[in-house]
Structure formats: C-alpha cells, structure tokens
C-alpha cells in the first residue's frame, strides 16, 4: 500500500497524545526543530538538492567543492505521530559521536498487521523496552513497516547521532533500524527494503558514510567479539554481524545487498 500520511497515523492515537504538548513531548519534538515544526506528526520528505544544500549549510559551508553524497530526506513519522508516551522514557537524551554504520533488525513480531495498526505495535514495543527490559527509551533509532513507512524510534532527533540500544557491543557510532515483522521463513516486502535504503541513504549520508562500504567499530563487549576489539563491518550490517543471533531473519539478511546498492545510488554514488 501507499505510505500512510501523517494524519492517517494520527487518527490511531489515544486522546491523551492528541492533547497539548507536555514538557517531555515538547522536548522530544524540539530536537527535530530544523526539520519539522514543534508538535509535528511527521518530518516531510525533501529532494536531494535541498537535502545537500541543508547539509552544506549545517556544516558552515566548509565542505570541499564536491557535493556531499547524501540521499533525499525521506518522510518520517515522528514519535508524536505514533503516540509515544514521553513520560515513559528517561528525560535526557543520549548521543554518540557519529553514525558510521546501520544495523538492520527484524522486530520478531507478527507479519499480519495492517499499516494503520503500526502506531499501536510501536507503543507496545516501546513499553516492553522500557518497562520489561529496563532501557531508557525505545531501543531502535528507527522502525520501518511493510508499507514502507519510516518511524522515529529513540528520542533525540532523527538527524542526530542518537545512542540506541539495539546491537549489544556496537551501539556507539551506529544506528539501529527495526523492520516490523519476522523474516526467518517469510521474505520482507519490497517496500520495507526500499525504505531501509532510503533511510540509510539519507542518515548515513549526513555523516559521510558510504552504504556500500566497510567500516571499523570498536566492540563494547558482546557474545561475538571481545571488548575492545576493532571489528570490520559492512556500513549496512545485520544484527547478526555484531551479535550471535538469528536477527534480522535469514530472508531479510539476504536483502541487505539490495538495500546497500539502492542506498548508494540514492546518494549519487
């Protein structure tokens, strides 16, 4: 289906979320102030030329004459758009130095949801991460649904290097993207793979990363690499590349090559 418009997503919100902004809601929205008005339910897409111009301006114009390799900014449903209860998370935002890599996950939840139900799915995952796992906030930096919609995950600003909780040992200098569903025996929808490519083309591009490239991340300690080891990884990796796990499912993992190629093309490489 076509990506849900922000107002379509808004319709599924609880009454409380549609009320005036609380201090926590305002803070979660203000970190996206360069991209969307305060209280916006979505960040609107921007074409590649304007995305490049914004990036050059943000860096004070101190780039080489070459235009930056960055994909067009995709539309992103904000936390307000999916009805995140901002009182659940820790109040302060946590950041990391840069974004050198993206780890792709599956949420290991059901595949039979309707895209109009996604705000409710995200609220459940959020509550689980905070209440059951004891994390400071939603673990993933972004979520993607089967219709190709992209959602803001952990609060702190969609264009910023927000520290997530997604790949034990490699949360620093990376981002985590959860594709909603389970892709062990079912293939991911094409729209979801394309959305991963669009999101990474933009977000990795903001930090100068090539989606088809390799990078080094220092392990913080996990079940695959000992703490302190420098690990060479694809810039777009699966969860299993940094941690011994089935995630993101065999059939989504097989599509990461497609996501890398499309993302690089969207960056103009």
Regions of interest found by a model, annotated:
Residues 88, 97-132:
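Active-site acidic/histidine clusters and adjacent loop/turn architecture
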Residues 136-137:
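Carboxylate/His-rich catalytic cores and anion/metal-binding grooves
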Residues 3-96, 101-103, 107, 146-161, ...:
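Basic/polar, cationic surfaces and motifs that engage anionic cell-wall
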């Amino acid at each position: 289906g076509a990506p849900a418009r922000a107002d379509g997503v808004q319709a599924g919100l609880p009454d409380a979320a549609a009320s005036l902004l609380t201090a926590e809601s305002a803070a979660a929205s203000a970190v996206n102030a360069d991209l969307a008005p305060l209280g916006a339910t979505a960040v609107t897409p921007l074409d590649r030329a304007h995305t490049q111009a914004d990036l050059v301006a943000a860096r004070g114009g101190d780039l080489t004459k070459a235009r930056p390799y960055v994909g067009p900014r995709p539309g992103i449903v904000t936390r307000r758009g999916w009805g995140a209860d901002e009182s659940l998370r820790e109040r302060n935002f946590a950041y990391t130095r840069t974004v050198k890599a993206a780890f792709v996950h599956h949420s290991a939840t059901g595949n039979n949801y309707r895209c109009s139900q996604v705000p409710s799915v995200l609220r459940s995952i959020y509550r689980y991460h905070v209440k059951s796992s004891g994390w400071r906030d939603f673990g993933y930096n972004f979520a993607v649904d089967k219709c190709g919609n992209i959602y803001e995950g952990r609060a702190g600003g969609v264009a910023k290097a927000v520290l997530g909780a997604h790949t034990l040992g490699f949360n620093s200098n990376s981002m985590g993207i959860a594709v909603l569903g389970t892709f062990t025996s079912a293939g991911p929808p094409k729209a979801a793979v394309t959305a991963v490519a669009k999101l990474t083309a933009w977000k990795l591009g903001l930090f100068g990363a090539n989606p088809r490239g390799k990078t080094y991340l220092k392990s913080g300690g996990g079940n695959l690499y000992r703490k302190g080891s420098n690990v060479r990884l694809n810039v777009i990796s699966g969860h299993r590349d940094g941690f011994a796990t089935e995630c993101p499912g065999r059939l989504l993992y097989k599509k990461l090559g497609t996501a890398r190629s499309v993302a690089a093309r969207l960056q103009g490489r």
